[in-house]
From Swiss-Prot:
Residues with 5-glutamyl histamine modification: Q205
Residue numbers with lipid attached (S-palmitoyl cysteine): C3, C351
Region described as G2 motif: 174-182
Ranges for region G3 motif: 197-206
Membrane topology according to the record: Lipid-anchor
Gene: Gnao1
Residues recorded with modification Deamidated asparagine: N346
Protein name: Guanine nucleotide-binding protein G(o) subunit alpha
Record Pfam families: G-alpha (PF00503)
Region span, G4 motif: 266-273
Physiological role: Guanine nucleotide-binding proteins (G proteins) function as transducers downstream of G protein-coupled receptors (GPCRs) in numerous signaling cascades. The alpha chain contains the guanine nucleotide binding site and alternates between an active, GTP-bound state and an inactive, GDP-bound state. Signaling by an activated GPCR promotes GDP release and GTP binding. The alpha subunit has a low GTPase activity that converts bound GTP to GDP, thereby terminating the signal. Both GDP release and GTP hydrolysis are modulated by numerous regulatory proteins.
Annotated SUPFAM superfamilies: P-loop containing nucleoside triphosphate hydrolases (SSF52540), Transducin (alpha subunit), insertion domain (SSF47895)
Length: 354
């Protein structure tokens, strides 16, 4: 016997289909809004990722941006040299040429007078160049894991003649490498692959982390940044804690947080360039005494990745891991393209469309 739907049943079926269609459309619309939370300990490269989004997905740095970053470059450069000078005393390193002591006093005086954001005078520039060329300063620089030094110190100090020029304008790379502590939450908007991204960069130092809670609602994915090169360094805010151990502890608390049960987690093992150089001289056993492998980039990076992945206690949660160099625009462009594809697939799956 045939099964004929009554008019009422047909109307109910049409209503059901319409509701399902609306739900799917709502799902697609929701899937187009992506809220990304950029987390990680201090100095892991989060703010550099944000700057890259400005280069890749917006119009890069404006004339006003360049103007604002210029004093930051001056400050980062002279503050880095002053940090090495101070460490000379702490570590008991002698200058190659004793006459450099007068140069070091000039540098430290400029910093103590808070004139570090101003263009370098000809006299100051000469003093800085002599200092950076000193064998004792270079020896102290090579021991930078024993004190706190900006990652970009060598980059800036190798460019002193360019940065010290009267007509100096910061390049894109100069701006990418600037270091300013993030306080509070910085929000960035951009569109990519028909998705509307809202990217939240949150201060990573311990004092800033209590502010993260405000960002927890409706997060599409978390990008968690780790400085691979921090494995043999201690924190700025607590010189008894290894930076990599701090990142692992933080990742554990984020990955297994009740707020993020259904949130995709993307792990950026960042500063791979610095790590590749450092691992040749500084063994991974400084951080992981039980590490059995060789001190090659491939083996050591793979071991660190395993340490982070093992913190995930949810059998249904996948950690998407990428080795990154946040100052390399091409690398970040390729990685972010892959991250976006993961987000699209996961969003569609969440809407039952994939």
């Amino acid at each position: 016997m045939g099964c004929t739907l009554s008019a009422e049943e047909r109307a109910a079926l049409e209503r059901s289909k319409a509701i399902e269609k609306n739900l799917k459309e709502d799902g697609i619309s929701a899937a187009k809004d992506v809220k990304l939370l950029l987390l990680g300990a201090g100095e892991s490269g989060k703010s550099t990722i944000v700057k890259q989004m400005k280069i890749i997905h917006e119009d890069g740095f404006s004339g006003e941006d360049v103007k604002q970053y210029k004093p930051v470059v001056y400050s980062n450069t002279i503050q880095s040299l002053a940090a090495i000078v101070r460490a000379m005393d702490t570590l008991g390193v002698e200058y190659g040429d004793k006459e450099r002591k007068a140069d070091s006093k000039m540098v430290c005086d400029v910093v103590s007078r808070m004139e570090d954001t101003e263009p370098f005078s000809a006299e100051l520039l000469s003093a800085m160049m002599r200092l950076w060329g000193d064998s004792g300063i270079q020896e102290c620089f090579n021991r930078s894991r024993e004190y706190q030094l900006n990652d970009s110190a060598k980059y800036y100090l190798d460019s002193l003649d360019r940065i010290g020029a009267a007509d100096y304008q910061p390049t894109e790379q100069d701006i990418l490498r600037t270091r300013v502590k993030t306080t509070g939450i910085v929000e960035t908007h951009f569109t990519f692959k028909n998705l509307h991204f809202r990217l939240f960069d949150v201060g990573g130092q311990r004092s800033e982390r209590k502010k993260w809670i405000h960002c927890f609602e409706d997060v599409t994915a978390i990008i968690f940044c780790v400085a691979l090169s921090g494995y043999d360094q201690v924190l700025h805010e607590d010189e008894t804690t290894n930076r990599m151990h701090e990142s692992l502890m933080l990742f554990d608390s984020i990955c297994n947080n009740k707020f993020f049960i259904d949130t995709s987690i993307i792990l950026f093992l960042n500063k791979k360039d610095l790590f590749g150089e450092k691992i040749k001289k500084s063994p991974l056993t400084i951080c992981f005494p039980e590490y059995p492998g060789s001190n090659t980039y491939e083996d050591a990076a793979a071991y660190i990745q395993t340490q982070f992945e093992s913190k995930n206690r949810s059998p249904n949660k996948e950690i998407y891991c990428h080795m990154t160099c946040a100052t390399d625009t091409n690398n970040i462009q390729v990685v972010f393209d892959a991250v976006t594809d993961i987000i699209i697939a996961n969003n569609l799956r969440g809407c039952g469309l994939y």
